[in-house]
Amino acid sequence: EQVVGKALKPYRQDVVIATKFSNVFDEETRQITGNDVSPEYIRAACEASLRRLDTDYIDLYQLHNGGLPTDDVDAVFDTLDDLVTQGKIRAYAWSTDTVDHAAYSATRDHVIAVQHRLNVIEDAPDMINVIESNDLASINRSPLGMGLLTGKYSAGSTFDAKDIRASNQEWMAYFTDGKPSARWLDKIASIRDILTSEGRTLAQGALAWLWARSENTIPIPGIRTIEQLEENAGAMEKGALTSVQMTEIQSILSS
């Protein structure tokens, strides 16, 4: 947040800043130490984000707890409504892959988006249906499949022990025992030629698929280098895939 705030300060009126809350974070050690969605914590976390971002308001404040029961989320949303009234945030969203949660959040006046996992090898038609029917933004987490859709990794690739992809956590679907899953690599190989058409890199093709998937999609690819940033931005010059290409991809992946 400090880096983003400093970089965007001269352009604040021209950009939309989104951030998340619920993970308790130690700024000194840079470690997550817990999870808290109490009204007191939400307000404190918002103030801390405003300070780090060096801004008077947050455009989109996102609940980063996809498994929170809907019975418990109303108190969260009520607190967020108060922050909207106070001018601290403009709107809010739920980061969740659960369709019912997305539909529930859509009943709130200040919810304008859902952040969820979506990419060319892992479509989410039910989620997209909820998002489109409620005129929400679809903010796409893992648009490049945690790196698999960059083409940099093969079945024999390994990761540093500090890399989360080596952790073998249950939700790490694209990787098995710290290595790229053959299942997902095979899917990518089957559609590579379509994604890399018209001079696109594989990553650019994956972003082009998302733009063609729905008018509501907003992919948020991670970047670590200037080169990755330029590659992702370059995808905009080539635009979305065509309807014919989208149909071909769907046919291949469903066979």
Predicted regions and their residues:
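Active-site groove signature of glycoside hydrolases
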Residues: 50-69
